[in-house]
Amino acid sequence: MEKEEIAALIDAAASPHIALAIHLLFATAGRIGAVLDLTWDRVEFQRGIINLRLDNAKTRKGRAIVPMNAGIRAALKTAHDAALSDYVIEYAGGKVKNIRKGFEAACRRAKLDNVTLHTIRHSSAVAMVSNGVPLEKVAQYLGHSNVAITYQTYARFAPDHLQDAAEILDFVRIREAR
């Protein structure tokens, strides 16, 4: 997804909890389960980190501890000031279990087709890789236990991926150098 589409999707969310969830998904590159499980005690404004990990995690999927950027920090501060529960994503003081309907409605309003909640995680990873963030850091950000997983999925989005191989095969330049 492009930056304009991301902004349009967040703006198209009809409810503050849907907008915050979408913003968190992009900012953390987290999975929806991790974002919906997030509690305020794992949002550390002082240190500038968001801890998506659970102590008693029943999931086999890795979860990360990620830094806050300025945009998500501001959104989280606003939400924290109005919080009625321990959960970051809440509605009427209770934990939100699913945002699918609100997310799909936001996609329709933003005129975005074929966008899923997991598309957001993928878009965040692609944005990091295509802007030169090393795959090792992207793997850590995504909570991947092995950088090979990240490499297999996202290496092709790196701006210089395979460029050195292409240069070796530049036979026209090699012939001109003779």
Regions flagged by a language model, labelled:
Residues 47, 58, 77-78, 82, ...:
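C-terminal secondary-structure termini that scaffold catalytic or DNA-interacting sites
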Residues 10, 57-77, 85-105, 116:
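C-terminal catalytic core of Y-nucleophile DNA break-rejoin enzymes
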Residues 19, 23, 27-34, 102-105, ...:
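C-terminal catalytic core of tyrosine-transesterase DNA break-rejoin enzymes
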